[in-house]
A protein has these predicted regions:
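A short beta-loop-alpha structural element at the N-terminal edge
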Residues: 2-16
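Conserved GNAT-fold acetyl-CoA-binding loop/helix
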Residues: 17-44
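Acetyl-CoA-dependent GNAT
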Residues: 35-90, 101, 161
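Glycine-rich acetyl-CoA-binding "A-motif" of GNAT/NAT acetyltransferases
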Residues: 61-64, 126, 152
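Conserved acetyl-CoA-binding loop-helix of GNAT-fold acetyltransferases
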Residues: 93-108, 129-133
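Conserved GNAT acetyl-CoA-binding A-motif
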Residues: 108-120
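Conserved catalytic-core motifs of GNAT/GCN5-like acyltransferases
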Residues: 117-120, 137-154
Length: 162
């Protein structure tokens, strides 16, 4: 398996939204309760201006995406970014998330970011374990603030200083 990272571009619109919509429909990893149309890709590209954002490819097939975005748009927060990544469900557990995290950490340093935040559903135990294993620590928890599929759950905030 040959993994590569390609800057997010228009050609990635459909596979990226399809991957995200899979998680909307089948998990608590993505918070919306209804899938998005392909125009949602424009929101991703708007939110990632000035930050690294990639389609993840395996042998020319898009198998995920990852990006950093502003935690807060105020200039006083410029050293803090929020991380997002979704890997196609049939590629989970193959080290791709680790590659994506390392790539984004390296790029974060290059754009002056030294704190990365992740917010994760309390029902997504695999993601929580992944982040803790990779140097994140829990820094906050909002209890029962979201309801999806008739289940209320917490949002856990994790932080990594790089």
């Amino acid at each position: 398996m040959n993994i590569s990272f390609e800057k997010i571009a228009e050609a990635h619109r459909i596979p990226i939204i399809d991957i995200f919509n899979y998680y909307i429909e089948n998990s608590f990893a993505a918070y919306p309760d209804k899938t998005f149309g392909y125009e949602f890709f424009d929101k991703i590209t708007d939110n990632t201006k000035g930050y690294p954002a990639y389609a993840i490819k395996s042998d020319e097939k898009i198998i995920g995406f990852c990006y950093l975005s502003a935690y807060n748009p105020l200039p006083s927060f410029k050293k803090t970014a929020q991380i997002t990544y979704f890997i196609a469900h049939d590629f989970i557990g193959k080290g791709i998330g680790t590659l994506a995290l390392k790539r984004l950490e390296d790029d974060a340093r290059n754009v002056g970011v030294d704190i990365i935040l992740a917010h994760i559903s309390s029902l997504n135990s695999e993601s929580i374990k992944f982040h803790l294993k990779n140097g994140f620590r829990e820094c906050g928890r909002f209890e029962n603030i979201i309801t999806k599929l008739n289940r209320s759950f917490d949002i856990i905030w994790l932080q990594k200083n790089i």
